[in-house]
Each structure stands twice: as C-alpha cells, then as structure tokens.
C-alpha cells in the first residue's frame, strides 16, 4: 500500500492534485483545504490511503495521520463510501466529527452534503465506541504532519477553491458564489477551510 508521497506538485485540480515522485505522477484525491495549501512546482509530503474498487484504484491524501485514520473509520459505517467520508472531512475536522458522534449531535453531522438524518443517526450508533481516541487527541501520536508551503493564500484563490468545492458537493454555482461572497465580506481573513465551513453553515441555514 502507498502510505505517503513526497514529491513535486505538478498539477492541482478541483478535487485532486498530481504529485511527481521519481518521474511518476500520482493523482491524489483530497479536501479543498489541503488543495489550497499545495503550490504547483513545489515539494509536498502527503499521507495517503489507497482505495481499491472493481473499476478503479484511487489514492486519497491527508494533512495528518488523524485525518487519514478518521477517513478509514468513517468507511466502516454501512452505506458510507470514500466520497462521503472525504466530504465529511471537507466540512468538519476529525475532532469535530468525533465530538458530534460522542454527543449524538446529528445536526452537526447533517451539515455535510449527502448526510441526512438517517446517515447521521447511523454514524452515531455505529461509531460511538470507535472515536474516543480522536476526541482525546491521541490518534495522530507519532503521526507525521504534512509539509505544505504558503498556508495563507490570496482571497481570490479562496473564492475559487471554495466555490468549486461547494459545486462539487452538490450546490449550484450561484448558491456557491453567493455564499462565498457573503462569508468573505463578513470576514476577509478566512482561509479556505474557514470559508468553506462558514459557507456551508450559511447554505444549511445555521
């Protein structure tokens, strides 16, 4: 299994990036927050998990070991695949996911596009005994932090990344653009992760 990649970022797309290692380019599917921190032409270290299906093999990338472990734990829930697991981590941090599950907070879990009441209840029931380590902050003990440059990116890049992420999560282009414009007008200092969460909260009426 490919557990990590260190190499040059040669392409950044809407939901994935290509990292070249020893002349081979690997496509890594990841969250908008991670994508926003990658810089084309510069080196990055990304922790990865490979998901093998009958029709495809995909690499998923993560900022730290905690995020990677949560991705795997989420997929133990019946009916929840890698796409929805990644959507969960695009909206909520591993700590927020674990707290919502521990506190039986279905409303917080339903902030994730694709997670309705039934799936939120299923997450709470099936994972309540599996997320205590995340809440305690011990899952990534010994884990390696991703090495990414330029975490603070320009506002226009935040707008583009967040709008594209929202469209990818199922919102219309107009809904996405309006929500991003609103939250950045209220707080121009927001980074991609913060803007995405604020926009999702607005779109869900929170």
Curated annotation (Swiss-Prot):
<protein>
    <recommendedName>
        <fullName>Holliday junction branch migration complex subunit RuvA</fullName>
    </recommendedName>
</protein>
<dbReference type="InterPro" id="IPR000085">
    <property type="entry name" value="RuvA"/>
</dbReference>
<dbReference type="InterPro" id="IPR013849">
    <property type="entry name" value="DNA_helicase_Holl-junc_RuvA_I"/>
</dbReference>
<dbReference type="Pfam" id="PF14520">
    <property type="entry name" value="HHH_5"/>
</dbReference>
<comment type="subunit">
    <text>Homotetramer. Forms an RuvA(8)-RuvB(12)-Holliday junction (HJ) complex. HJ DNA is sandwiched between 2 RuvA tetramers; dsDNA enters through RuvA and exits via RuvB. An RuvB hexamer assembles on each DNA strand where it exits the tetramer. Each RuvB hexamer is contacted by two RuvA subunits (via domain III) on 2 adjacent RuvB subunits; this complex drives branch migration. In the full resolvosome a probable DNA-RuvA(4)-RuvB(12)-RuvC(2) complex forms which resolves the HJ.</text>
</comment>
<dbReference type="GO" id="GO:0006281">
    <property type="term" value="P:DNA repair"/>
</dbReference>
<keyword id="KW-0227">DNA damage</keyword>
<feature type="region of interest" description="Flexible linker">
    <location>
        <begin position="143"/>
        <end position="153"/>
    </location>
</feature>
<dbReference type="InterPro" id="IPR036267">
    <property type="entry name" value="RuvA_C_sf"/>
</dbReference>
<dbReference type="GO" id="GO:0009379">
    <property type="term" value="C:Holliday junction helicase complex"/>
</dbReference>
<dbReference type="GO" id="GO:0009432">
    <property type="term" value="P:SOS response"/>
</dbReference>
<comment type="function">
    <text>The RuvA-RuvB-RuvC complex processes Holliday junction (HJ) DNA during genetic recombination and DNA repair, while the RuvA-RuvB complex plays an important role in the rescue of blocked DNA replication forks via replication fork reversal (RFR). RuvA specifically binds to HJ cruciform DNA, conferring on it an open structure. The RuvB hexamer acts as an ATP-dependent pump, pulling dsDNA into and through the RuvAB complex. HJ branch migration allows RuvC to scan DNA until it finds its consensus sequence, where it cleaves and resolves the cruciform DNA.</text>
</comment>
<feature type="region of interest" description="Domain II">
    <location>
        <begin position="64"/>
        <end position="142"/>
    </location>
</feature>
<dbReference type="InterPro" id="IPR011114">
    <property type="entry name" value="RuvA_C"/>
</dbReference>
<dbReference type="GO" id="GO:0048476">
    <property type="term" value="C:Holliday junction resolvase complex"/>
</dbReference>
<dbReference type="GO" id="GO:0009378">
    <property type="term" value="F:four-way junction helicase activity"/>
</dbReference>
<dbReference type="Pfam" id="PF01330">
    <property type="entry name" value="RuvA_N"/>
</dbReference>
<dbReference type="Pfam" id="PF07499">
    <property type="entry name" value="RuvA_C"/>
</dbReference>
<feature type="region of interest" description="Domain III">
    <location>
        <begin position="154"/>
        <end position="206"/>
    </location>
</feature>
<dbReference type="GO" id="GO:0005737">
    <property type="term" value="C:cytoplasm"/>
</dbReference>
<keyword id="KW-0963">Cytoplasm</keyword>
<dbReference type="GO" id="GO:0006310">
    <property type="term" value="P:DNA recombination"/>
</dbReference>
<dbReference type="InterPro" id="IPR010994">
    <property type="entry name" value="RuvA_2-like"/>
</dbReference>
<dbReference type="GO" id="GO:0005524">
    <property type="term" value="F:ATP binding"/>
</dbReference>
<dbReference type="InterPro" id="IPR012340">
    <property type="entry name" value="NA-bd_OB-fold"/>
</dbReference>
<keyword id="KW-0233">DNA recombination</keyword>
<keyword id="KW-0234">DNA repair</keyword>
<feature type="region of interest" description="Domain I">
    <location>
        <begin position="1"/>
        <end position="63"/>
    </location>
</feature>
<comment type="similarity">
    <text>Belongs to the RuvA family.</text>
</comment>
<dbReference type="GO" id="GO:0000400">
    <property type="term" value="F:four-way junction DNA binding"/>
</dbReference>
<keyword id="KW-0238">DNA-binding</keyword>
